[in-house]
């Protein structure tokens, strides 16, 4: 299935208003016996998607390091002493070459990320050229550029952008414990601008930052209860980066991660639920459980911005073992 078929799946999603969820209801999902929760999530998944198809996206850092923000998990913050080297915005020809290589390896969506609080107008103009050139390859396009100013989302839409990623990261209650340089409401404002411009929203969170199960449930509720749920929901498993405040965070129970995938699938039945950062540390068996719980998208390629990802050969072998197809 190519990009046009992906669009057909999305456009075929029910247009009826999504139900409103409460934190107590999502906590009730988390509290179910794991096998019952996965069974329910798989049923919801099968009603809306091909259960044996996984969408593959590639993520490229087009501007690395030197970010002014203080996100406690991030290796690209200028406030922390990490191994990430600051790099300027990547030349257009290098971005296009990377997109072509990703397409040749089976990716249908190409995501471009830049480490800054938000794009300056002259930098945005260069990103617009990247979007146009990648779009011309027949790939879906996505960017993650931080917070947007008035009018910038419309420019991205005019360039042909399909998705804008801006994660909520965690719920409003826990947010101030991991980020202080901007607010949870700032992120919601950018999502509103993206939605108003007619761009598909990609927004999810990071699990394992020290938040409680209630915080995780509240994040899912916040996403599901947006005026329109995100079309794409990346779920990241924290990768502790040396030099960041979360470097020594204990690992999350893998089954809790599966529960989060399942709860997200049930609460957002027509969204693409993506396995994102942290997959390199997951066993094939854990990833298979996540697919069974409703994940149907993944990042494909050796790196996600600055963290590792399973190599392509491992992913291809996993798909063959599971009998699933890439789209």
Curated annotation (Swiss-Prot):
Q: What is the annotated role of this protein in its UniProt record?
A: Catalyzes the conversion of dethiobiotin (DTB) to biotin by the insertion of a sulfur atom into dethiobiotin via a radical-based mechanism.
Q: Write out the residues that bind [4Fe-4S] cluster.
A: 67, 71, 74
**To which species is this protein native?**
Dechloromonas aromatica (strain RCB)
Subunit record text: Homodimer.
Q: Which reaction does it catalyse?
A: (4R,5S)-dethiobiotin + (sulfur carrier)-SH + 2 reduced [2Fe-2S]-[ferredoxin] + 2 S-adenosyl-L-methionine = (sulfur carrier)-H + biotin + 2 5'-deoxyadenosine + 2 L-methionine + 2 oxidized [2Fe-2S]-[ferredoxin]
InterPro entries associated with the record: Aldolase_TIM (IPR013785), BATS_dom (IPR010722), Biotin_synth/BioAB (IPR002684), Biotin_synthase (IPR024177), Elp3/MiaA/NifB-like_rSAM (IPR006638), rSAM (IPR007197)
Q: Which UniProt keywords apply?
A: 2Fe-2S, 4Fe-4S, Biotin biosynthesis, Iron, Iron-sulfur, Metal-binding, S-adenosyl-L-methionine, Transferase
Q: Which family does it belong to?
A: Belongs to the radical SAM superfamily. Biotin synthase family.
In short, the EC number is 2.8.1.6
Q: Name one GO biological process term.
A: biotin biosynthetic process
Superkingdom, natural source: Bacteria
Q: In which pathway does it act?
A: Cofactor biosynthesis; biotin biosynthesis; biotin from 7,8-diaminononanoate: step 2/2
Its ancestry begins with:
Bacteria, Pseudomonadati, Pseudomonadota, Betaproteobacteria, Rhodocyclales
Q: Which Gene3D superfamilies match?
A: Aldolase class I (3.20.20.70)
Name under which the protein is recorded = Biotin synthase
Instruction: Name the cofactor(s) required for activity, per the record.
Output: [4Fe-4S] cluster; [2Fe-2S] cluster
Pfam families, alphabetized: BATS, Radical_SAM
Q: Which residues bind [2Fe-2S] cluster?
A: 111, 142, 202, 274
Q: Which GO terms describe its molecular function?
A: 2 iron, 2 sulfur cluster binding; 4 iron, 4 sulfur cluster binding; biotin synthase activity; iron ion binding
Q: Where is the Radical SAM core domain?
A: 52-279
Q: What class of enzyme is it?
A: transferase
Record PROSITE patterns = RADICAL_SAM
């Amino acid at each position: 299935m190519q990009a046009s078929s992906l669009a057909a799946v999305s456009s075929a999603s029910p247009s009826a208003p999504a139900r409103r969820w409460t934190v107590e209801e999502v906590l009730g999902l988390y509290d179910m016996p794991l096998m019952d929760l996965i069974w329910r999530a798989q049923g919801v998944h099968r009603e809306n998607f091909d259960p044996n198809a996984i969408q593959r996206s590639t993520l490229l850092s087009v501007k690395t390091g030197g970010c002014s923000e203080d996100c406690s998990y991030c290796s690209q913050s200028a406030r922390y002493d990490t191994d990430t080297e600051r790099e300027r915005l990547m030349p257009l020809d290098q971005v296009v070459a990377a997109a072509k290589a990703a397409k040749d390896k089976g990716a249908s969506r190409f995501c471009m990320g830049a480490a800054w609080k938000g794009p300056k107008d002259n930098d945005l103009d260069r990103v617009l050229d990247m979007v146009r050139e990648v779009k011309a390859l027949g790939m879906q396009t996505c960017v993650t550029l931080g917070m947007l100013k008035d009018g910038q989302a419309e420019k991205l839409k005019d360039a042909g952008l399909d998705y804008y990623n801006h994660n909520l990261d965690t719920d409003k209650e826990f947010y101030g414990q991991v980020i202080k340089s901007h607010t949870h409401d700032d992120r919601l404002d950018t999502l509103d601008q993206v939605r108003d411009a007619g761009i598909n929203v990609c927004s999810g969170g990071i699990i394992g930052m020290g938040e409680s199960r209630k915080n995780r449930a509240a994040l899912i509720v916040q996403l599901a209860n947006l005026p329109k749920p995100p079309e794409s929901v990346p779920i990241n498993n924290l990768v502790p980066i040396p030099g960041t405040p979360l470097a020594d965070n204990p690992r999350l129970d893998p089954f809790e991660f599966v529960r989060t995938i399942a709860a997200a699938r049930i609460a957002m039945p027509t969204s693409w639920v993506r396995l994102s950062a942290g997959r390199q540390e997951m066993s094939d068996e854990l990833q298979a459980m996540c697919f069974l719980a409703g994940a149907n998208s993944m990042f494909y390629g050796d790196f996600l911005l600055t963290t590792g990802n399973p190599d392509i050969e491992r992913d291809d072998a996993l798909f063959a073992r599971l009998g699933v197809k890439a789209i």
